[in-house]
Amino acid sequence: GYKTEGIISSQDIAEAIPKSLQDNIFDMTQLLLRGQIQSVRELVHDLRLQGEDEIKLIAVMLGQFRTYLQVKLLSAQGKSEQQIVSSLSDCLGRKVNQFQVRFALRDSRPLSVAFLKMTIKILVETDYQIKTGTLDKDYLFDLALLKIVSNR
């Protein structure tokens, strides 16, 4: 996928640089929240081909949805972005990135607390089912994604 002629654009560079798992999960979450399940499936397929495991995908997604829920609850208490960064940093025992909070505030705005709690519950249950080997992990992960989309 390298360009052999013409001017190299920033998009060409972006396409040539592999995305981090975090970036891919962020994209997947955005697609999921927009109900674009086919695009989500394609991205998950690509991640599986890259050797990413469902348990790892769930762990990163859980982190993202927990952050959404935390910033939504703190924002509802009237806390500013800076106060949220400070509260989460204290709670987690590590410095939380301000941009992560800013994007989480923006992305969680249209989501209900009930939806976020339900999504976290679905991901935790799916993680448990995969780890206990009740059913095929690909099937369980796909089912979790469908449940999340249908609860939006």
Each PLM stretch: what is its role?
Residues 1-26, 31-34:
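Long, charge-dense, solvent-exposed interaction surfaces that engage phosphate-rich ligands
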